[in-house]
Amino acid sequence: PTPEELGDGIYRIYYSGRNNNNQSHISWVDVDLNKPYQVIKYSDGPVLAPGALGCFDDNGVTPSCVINLGNGEKALYFIGWNPGSTVRMHLFGGLAISTDNGKTFSRFSRAPIIERCSTDPYLNTAPWVVKIEDGFHMYYVSGHEWKNKDLPRYNIKMAHSKDGKNWERDGHVCIDFKDDSENALARPYVIFEDKLWKMWFAYKSQKYRIGYAESIDGIDWIRQDELAGIDVGNTGFDDDMIEYAAVVRYNDQHFMFYNGNNYGVDGIGLAVEK
């Protein structure tokens, strides 16, 4: 789930659903946090479909971040899925732009905005972008290695941009593995609050859990997973795994959208700060 604030407690939640060919498309629902269990509007259909055959996103697209640029323009950063041969899949970050306040989106480029490079030779995906005074920061998932065809290891790194489209990377790691058993650090979600940068992310040894980190400068981070504020449920759709958290603050209360068992097969969960 990728939320966008619309005002008065209404949030647009971008999500990916799969078709009969198991290809993900991006759609959205509007929810009112004053009535958090009520969906008030659905998109008429997907706002972004898989790319052309042979492109980095020809087998699916998943939303990662939405930024309102003003004057009716929005930037949708997304994950592009492409099946592999020697490895199970390739994942790269893309960008789509809306000039009609989010009614429709068009790709900025048919190529990824974060492709392979000398510091990131494997997958580069799940971009979360924040606007800063002199440009943009991106927190993204970077492949560290493939243990075998079906098991990649990936951590969270950082990139910088003046325009939000062209990115510079130096390999700086923001969130690294706790130990050798940890193989996945996924979906960074970053906010600035109370003079601190705060990040929620997913981490996995056997089953996904939601982690948390803080930073003074947005560059160097300290993991404090015990402060994530949530664990698996006792029963139900999230009793085995939880992942892909997105946290918003409304009326001095935090709301967390997240996925549960089997990567969200039952839909999107909502947790409310006590």
What positions do the PLM features span?
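Beta-rich carbohydrate-recognition and catalytic domains
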Residues: 1-59, 67-122, 130-186, 191-240, ...
